[in-house]
Curated annotation (Swiss-Prot):
Keyword Nucleus: no
Modified residues (Pyrrolidone carboxylic acid): Q21
Record protein name field: Complement component C8 gamma chain
Organism: Homo sapiens
Segments passing through the bilayer: none
Protein localization: Secreted; Target cell membrane
Regulation: Membrane attack complex (MAC) assembly is inhibited by CD59, thereby protecting self-cells from damage during complement activation. MAC assembly is also inhibited by clusterin (CLU) chaperones that inhibit polymerization of C9.
Amino acid sequence: MLPPGTATLLTLLLAAGSLGQKPQRPRRPASPISTIQPKANFDAQQFAGTWLLVAVGSACRFLQEQGHRAEATTLHVAPQGTAMAVSTFRKLDGICWQVRQLYGDTGVLGRFLLQARDARGAVHVVVAETDYQSFAVLYLERAGQLSVKLYARSLPVSDSVLSGFEQRVQEAHLTEDQIFYFPKYGFCEAADQFHVLDEVRR
């Protein structure tokens, strides 16, 4: 049985009519991520494998308060039809945990939907940029809040990749102070059966 709050913590870590017409419902503002274009002809097979989390641009209060406690984070990606099975590995209190999730198909290459497992709502995911061999930039949106993540196949990443990421963060109306860089060591490669959070089956 998971310790109290563990599932929540891990999940926190990887949206008048005119006269004589019927009044119309006010239009919902466009979702921030709806304007982000996915990688052209995104290929999930090439994207598969291991990715290391380098940095996150986000206004998330949790990161603002706990960013100094960030742990090295690894993403393992495996295509599953038109969806992607994603496992996130990170430490919590010195113990390696695995979080299993399914990035569901949306009918658009490079655009995915992670179904909600709690009241905070679904997560929209866009793989916006990648060369498949060295880096990837992903956008995630939940409840209208956008974040930008930079992943790499290996570390360190080039200055040009970092500059490109920082530019995207700025274009997402986030500031330099809202960029959090993750540790470059201490990555988990596996977790035992007692430290697996399966978001797919819950």
